[in-house]
């Protein structure tokens, strides 16, 4: 009897979790700006996904940011890999190439992050909060203040955040909210200094010949970039005790 009860409880917990996730989008529509975005963009999104043979709503999304190109790529789940849905330009930008290491340094972070929260009443229209500082950032900034409150948002104004056009953040926000409602609890946001093709990466390293720590950091990011480029599957990464990003398993 006890195994049966345990199994039933497990089923109830799974059902409750799925119901809560599915309610997420409905709750978001209770906010004026999200409702406006939904009313103006949902039919277009549905049509575009259908024309491209993509499932709607998306079961998962993945964001890649390239600072030098001012580019935000949004990928969506397609079968067992990811398909590029759209490439957005970001219009508000501060700092230079390289990671964020201190409060007030104006830098847009670089590394492997996740969306931690949705802000439907942002001062910048709509925003997605990132988990900066992550484990790697905290190790590299021990004894200092790494800063925080890093978002992807609208209004084309930025001090260390990723800012896009208002209609673009509406679309990104809706698709991320759809994926969250479909059960994706961790929405990855990978931020690179530039598109790390072999040619561009070699040129990037030539700019930091006397900065081996920065060159090593960018080499870690390239490993994650290359892993995704091989099969369009989001790589699994971990942070080791020294703060280095490591690929898990056979992705190397």
Placement of each model-derived feature along the sequence:
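Cell wall/extracellular polymer interaction/catalysis modules
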Residues: 22-159, 167-187, 196-252
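Bacterial N-terminal signal peptides
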Residues: 6-15
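Hydrophobic transmembrane alpha-helices
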Residues: 192-193
């Amino acid at each position: 009897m006890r195994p049966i009860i345990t199994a039933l409880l497990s089923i109830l917990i799974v059902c409750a979790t799925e119901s809560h996730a599915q309610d997420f989008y409905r709750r978001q529509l209770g906010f004026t700006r999200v409702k406006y975005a939904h009313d103006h963009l949902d039919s277009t999104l549905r049509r575009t996904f259908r024309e491209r043979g993509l499932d709607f709503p998306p079961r998962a999304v993945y964001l890649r940011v390239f600072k030098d190109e001012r580019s935000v790529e949004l990928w969506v789940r397609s079968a067992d890999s990811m398909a590029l849905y759209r490439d957005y330009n970001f219009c508000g930008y501060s700092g230079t190439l390289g990671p964020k290491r201190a409060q007030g340094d104006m830098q847009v972070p670089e590394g492997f992050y996740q969306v931690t929260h949705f802000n439907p009443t942002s001062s910048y229209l709509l925003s997605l909060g990132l988990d900066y500082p992550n484990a790697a950032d905290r190790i590299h900034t021990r004894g200092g203040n790494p800063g925080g409150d890093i978002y992807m948002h609208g209004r084309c104004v930025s001090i260390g955040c990723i800012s896009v056009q208002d209609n673009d953040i509406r679309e990104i926000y809706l698709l991320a909210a759809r994926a969250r409602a479909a059960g994706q609890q961790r929405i990855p946001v990978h931020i690179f200094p530039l598109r790390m093709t072999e040619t561009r990466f070699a040129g990037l390293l030539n700019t930091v010949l006397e900065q081996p720590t920065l060159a090593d950091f960018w080499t870690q990011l390239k490993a994650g970039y290359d892993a995704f480029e091989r099969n369009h599957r989001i790589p699994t990464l971990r942070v080791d005790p020294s703060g280095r990003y490591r690929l898990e398993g056979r992705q190397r």
